[in-house]
Amino acid sequence: MDINEVHFIYFSPTRTSKQVGEAIVRGTGLTNVVTTNLTLHTAEVDIPENTLTVIAVPVYGGKVAPLAMERLQGIRGSGSPVVLVVVYGNRAYEKALIELDAFASAQGFKVIAGATFVGEHSYSTEQNPIAPGRPDTNDLQYAEEFGAKIRTKINAAVDMEHLYPVDVNRIQRPRQPFLPLFKFLRRVI
């Protein structure tokens, strides 16, 4: 399949979503990269069908950050393949990936991959560290490997019709033990 450009779109106030997304883009091996940073402003972008898109956003309270969702409204696909990435603060991403999937599909994208990564929580402090230093070197290496697998999937498809979508509902979420959740809630309340 002939895809030779990747459009990287991100919202990343603490830079963790940006770091993970950049690693995934590197892993694809595509060198023609267009970047849209939605952290400070909105953008109107129409993505052509033969362009891979990577969208990376943070999770706040188990959902895609509301401001990120607002700023993504101007992004439209034309049946374009998209990779969805949510970065959460080591508590839980809950239904954020499903929410982003519904949005991307409604905007005309074909979801071909989805991923969740841990980033240092925005409430993390020296006294109460929550995933400090994440994404770390191992996380970013895994993100690059994920990008390479996406490229393999694209290369294996004869055409867009054979670039099969992924059902993010089937991605197994890690179990959240009650004690760490309780400790987290105690710290932030």
Each language-model region and where it sits:
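Iron-sulfur cluster-binding cysteine motifs and their immediate structural context
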Residues: 189
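FMN-binding flavodoxin-like domain, especially the glycine-rich phosphate-binding loop
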Residues: 1-8, 12-39, 43-186
